[in-house]
Amino acid sequence: MIPVKICGIRRLDDALLSLDEGAWALGFIFHRPSPRFIDPVEAAALLSKIRERSGAEFRAVGVFVDWALDELNAVVREVGLDAAQLHGAEDPGYAASVEAAEVWKAFRVGPDFEASRPDDYPSKMRVLLDGWSPTEAGGTGEVFDWSIARACQETRPVFLAGGIDAGNIAAAIAEVRPFGIDVSSGVESSPGIKDGELIRKLFSEARACSSD
């Protein structure tokens, strides 16, 4: 099955169900304006419980938007994150100074986005492409032009985000052939509230794609 990251985890049951279904990564959002925000102290406690209760291997990914570098690195250590996802205007120099085992750079694909832009960042960094909004940093549920993701995918592996759900994940995989899929609002009944049935449907579709 294609790697799937479920982002915006705030509840233990949602995390355990996602892992039972085969999630490759779980995302914890440290951007206070987001309805999916979780305080780092709460995230550390939640992550500890997840690791105690689940025998699954997964990546714990912290999502940050334009944090001070020293504060971000402290959260990576204190929460026990495997990866830091930079979802703001962080430049290549900042990204290279992040002290996490993995660094992901997210790009919001707006009208002026150029497919070559991720190439400015170190090749070892994972690239995530998300829908663009003039008011929100992520989790908008907006699907963007997937031809841009295909163009990026020609030079480096891409995680595809932006409005992915059970209804379009098969088309996204077929059209883009991304390295992985990132889902947040697509498995929610309302902003920030994950829905178990939607999680199950998403993974059912993802598994069906892998068996085609």
Q: Which role fits each region the language model picked out?
A:
Residues 1-212:
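Conserved N-terminal beta1-alpha1 strand-loop-helix module at the mouth
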